[in-house]
Amino acid sequence: MSNIHDHKILILDFGSQYTQLIARRIREIGVYCELWAWDVSEAQIREFAPNGIILAGGPESVTADNSPRAPEYVFNAGVPVLGICYGMQTMSEQLGGKVIQGVGEGEFGYAQIELQTTSALFKSIEDAVSAEGKPLLDVWMSHGDKVSAIPDGFVTVAKTATCPFAAMANEEKGFYGVQFHPEVTHTRQGQRMLEHFALDICGCKANWKPSSIIEDAIERLKKQIGDDEVILGLSGGVDSSVVAMLLHRAIGDKLTCVFVDNGLLRLNEAEQVLEMFGDHFGLNIVHVDAENRFLDAMAGEAEPEAKRKIIGRVFVEIFDEESKKCANAKWLAQGTIYPDVIESAGSATGKAHVIKSHHNVGGLPADMKMGLVEPLRELFKDEVRKIGLELGLPYNMLYRHPFPGPGLGVRVLGEVKKEYCDLLRSADAIFIEELHKADLYNKVSQAFTVFLPVRSVGVMGDGRKYDWVVSLRAVETIDFMTAHWAHLPYDFLGRVSNRIINEVDGISRVVYDISGKPPATIEWE
């Protein structure tokens, strides 16, 4: 088996919002990479032994005092280096070039660069050709400062009307700088540039693929766990489901999954989880029906944060009780993924990301004397989904819209009662079913129903009814940091509303939430 970590790229983070996207793009090429703070030590780089280094973008100005710099060793490590945006500017400045502060003439958004010479980074890439016969590329810019003089040994590879050095290269050393962002989809050929860098220039092999990741994870789990037993909190969500399947492959019936039904799940969700993992895949599952315990604990509480804390506390209590029954379990498995491990924090400047020692996702008791098993901690969410498919989990489950940890506890506004949860479950199921029927489910990023603790007058037949109100919510987003409300067709919304009011006894009115994020959040609570 080829070692999937043998060929790898190191990405140094200077604080750009796109840095994780660079890592995901490199992984998509099939090459392993890690994301580290810009102020990493020479010893750490030597130990990691990357085949190439990428200097990512960032919000700082190279011209400012004490702005972040790449470690000098980066340029003496004998491996290719690619500087992106701020990364190009600091490369240029550190190697003897010049950077000037932008004064009202930065480039933000779409731009077209004109290639001036051939380069390994841009081999056989063009979107159009200029009148003079030079290749043109559509790219995405986001910079104020710019390079005004390139270092000795470099050549100008590309320019724009306002940026004389949109790309530079020292082919002999394998140093490249681009002022634009190849990692965003607006740069049409960006992925091909990153492929050229990782595969051709750095010489990496594309070993990082789902089947190899699974093989490697199983081998490492067997080595870590040996003949011990493992306990896992299985929620039915993507991360815990994939962890369950990996562990089942690695250690079989030495895995015990604890599934806690808190009464705050979607319609028939508990039955689906038990059927899929218990009956179909044959995992050892302990089913805890704790609906009354959760609802009793939340009785009378209307404040969202307090509800979240109660739900978290009761889950921990139950999991602790169940883990004590598994006396032989030496390991606790968690669905920690790579973005959980990368945490914005204070290095010397407060401008870097640091790596946590571990991320205790469930907030489990500190006195649980178990080792931690986190087989997904190197993976991004999209990678977790891909290996889930490879492990045989259904597409519809892996690519379902996000569901909050506290479940319906934060989709029932105010106090949570069984009656409200039951009404909400039924209404939400109709909304989701109709989205699938209309082929709209995968065209929105997230859709759900919210129960409002207000009654509204309605008319059914000749009678007057005074029942509850629900709101439909659907959004479109790329990163969930900002979102637009989804412009669903009126006839579709009318159909959903009619079905809910006619089929769910207790709901008299349906409204549609047309708030964007910001100012509103995606979830109501």
Curated annotation (Swiss-Prot):
Active site (UniProt): C85 (nucleophile), H181, E183
Domain Glutamine amidotransferase type-1: 8-207
Record: residues binding ATP: S235, G236, G237, V238, D239, S240, S241
Catalytic activity reported: XMP + L-glutamine + ATP + H2O = GMP + L-glutamate + AMP + diphosphate + 2 H(+)
Pathway, per record: Purine metabolism; GMP biosynthesis; GMP from XMP (L-Gln route): step 1/1
Gene3D superfamilies documented for this protein: 3.30.300.10, 3.40.50.880, HUPs
Matches recorded under CDD domains: GATase1_GMP_Synthase, GMP_synthase_C
Function: Catalyzes the synthesis of GMP from XMP.
UniProt name for this protein: GMP synthase [glutamine-hydrolyzing]
